[in-house]
Amino acid sequence: MDKKKEHPEMRIPLQTAVEVSDWPCSTSHDPHSGLGMVLGMLAVLGLSSVTLILFLWQGATSFTSHRMFPEEVPSWSWETLKGDAEQQNNSCQLILVESIPEDLPFAAGSPTAQPLAQAWLQLLDTARESVHIASYYWSLTGLDIGVNDSSSRQGEALLQKFQQLLLRNISVVVATHSPTLAKTSTDLQVLAAHGAQIRQVPMKQLTGGVLHSKFWVVDGRHIYVGSANMDWRSLTQVKELGAIIYNCSNLAQDLEKTFQTYWVLGTPQAVLPKTWPRNFSSHINRFHPLRGPFDGVPTTAYFSASPPSLCPHGRTRDLDAVLGVMEGARQFIYVSVMEYFPTTRFTHHARYWPVLDNALRAAALNKGVHVRLLVSCWFNTDPTMFAYLRSLQAFSNPSAGISVDVKVFIVPVGNHSNIPFSRVNHSKFMVTDKTAYVGTSNWSEDYFSHTAGVGLIVSQKTPRAQPGATTVQEQLRQLFERDWSSHYAMDLDRQVPSQDCVW
């Protein structure tokens, strides 16, 4: 493996330090902050809507001279989801899913989530009309990277599954980042040849970041969201964590609105609107979450988004969601994330950004919350991260009731050194005694201010009538503690082989 190569998640384009406008999102400061924006929007829409539409789109489009992408006539109104999703009764069911890399065994009897490869195929089996996917890039075959390895078979089976859906006239719609990182992959060309609709979103030109989201909306009823890319390595060589929600049209159609922000920006000459039209607005957010039973368990849930410029009115900003989860904790905050930097990561000159770092310290000091941070270390780790991790660890003072612990999780390379950009814990989640957060972003400023991502925030209470029911935050806590107590999680003073981790 060439140490000078960069992992796809680290190849986010350099950004200039641009101030982000105050977009009409739900913020942690004022639950009614969008009201004035809505009134102003109503006054302006009559004069500006025609101009805005003409500026955003100039006719039907095809992205390449080979006409890989079907021509479409864009519209501010998103594509209507097929079927009768709005009429379906919600009987929401949430399932945690994960990928455990090959040759990464845990102790017998350890808690597990449903295997991601199996869960994705089962989710696609439910599709009757449409599958909408927001993705960073696609690389589902070993040939994409010149690797002949049996561990690529699950990704190849997934690609075949998508082709089968298209042959059954099930719509497959993909919004992905442009330019793609998987430059030798033919996955999207293959799907387009079978009738998939694909748009590439030049996110760097629009927000200064990338389209880093990883979620699916199936039939306007079912959802996947999590850390896994559309990459065969995410199924067998990289540790991932996500969630699938079945039969939850209210949440699914709310997440669909975020998908549609990407979709409309994937047209030629698209620009970010100063104010998103009302049909992109959300009424499900931090201050007004969806409330109802998930498998009989009382649940609140909502989606957040980043960056602020992709938050129409009512959408909670991802950073505000993360801070809100921390603020609500009373006993513990456990975080598992690939990278942790209290700085910018992709600007020409790094800028200090202590927002999340301060929030963890404040929770530990002010409320006596037990903080645990599990960060990944692998062959492509930037070793400057460890100074920040040691600084946070040094804040711990058990005699004063301040508990902050930091470990690194290392996936041994073993005999898999022939597979580049693998063998890493890629999860991005947080769990407290009150709430579970499953996201798509690493923790540095750029992911929240410039890069497109989403978060799922869920809180459950065990009903008295179901004393044996396990809340999603309890399930996620068990998975975190399994990882934390395993021999793959190491204290910051440990020495490890450089093949597995650049310390």
From Swiss-Prot:
Enriched in the white matter of early postnatal brains, as well as in splenic marginal zone cells. Highly expressed in dendritic cells (DCs) and other myeloid cells, with lower expression in B cell. The chain crosses the membrane at residues 37-57. It catalyses: Exonucleolytic cleavage in the 5'- to 3'-direction to yield nucleoside 3'-phosphates; a 5'-end 5'-dephospho-ribonucleotidyl-ribonucleotide-RNA + H2O = a ribonucleoside 3'-phosphate + a 5'-end dephospho-ribonucleoside-RNA + H(+); a ribonucleoside 3'-phosphate-2'-3'-cyclophospho-GMP + H2O = a ribonucleoside 3'-phosphate + 2',3'-cyclophospho-GMP + H(+); a 5'-end 5'-dephospho-2'-deoxyribonucleotidyl-2'-deoxyribonucleotide in single-stranded DNA + H2O = a 5'-end dephospho-2'-deoxyribonucleoside in single-stranded DNA + a 2'-deoxyribonucleoside 3'-phosphate + H(+). InterPro entries: Diverse_PLD-related, PLDc_3, PLipase_D/transphosphatidylase. It is a single-pass type II membrane protein. It is an enzyme of class 3 (hydrolase). It comes from Mus musculus (Mouse). Disulfide bonds join 92-248, 377-501. Residues 58-503 are lumenal. The lineage of its organism: Eukaryota, Metazoa, Chordata, Craniata, Vertebrata. It is found in: Endoplasmic reticulum membrane; Golgi apparatus, trans-Golgi network membrane; Nucleus; Early endosome. Belongs to the phospholipase D family. One of its GO terms (biological process) is establishment of localization in cell. Highly N-glycosylated. GO terms for cellular component: early endosome; endoplasmic reticulum; endoplasmic reticulum membrane; lysosome; nucleus; phagocytic vesicle; trans-Golgi network membrane. This is 5'-3' exonuclease PLD4. Induction: Up-regulated by lipopolysaccharide (LPS) stimulation in microglia. Increased expression in activated microglia and in the demyelinating lesions of adult brain. Signal peptide: none annotated. Glycans are attached at residues 89, 148, 169, 247, 279, 415, 425, 442. Residues 1-36 are cytoplasmic. One of its GO terms (molecular function) is phospholipase D activity.
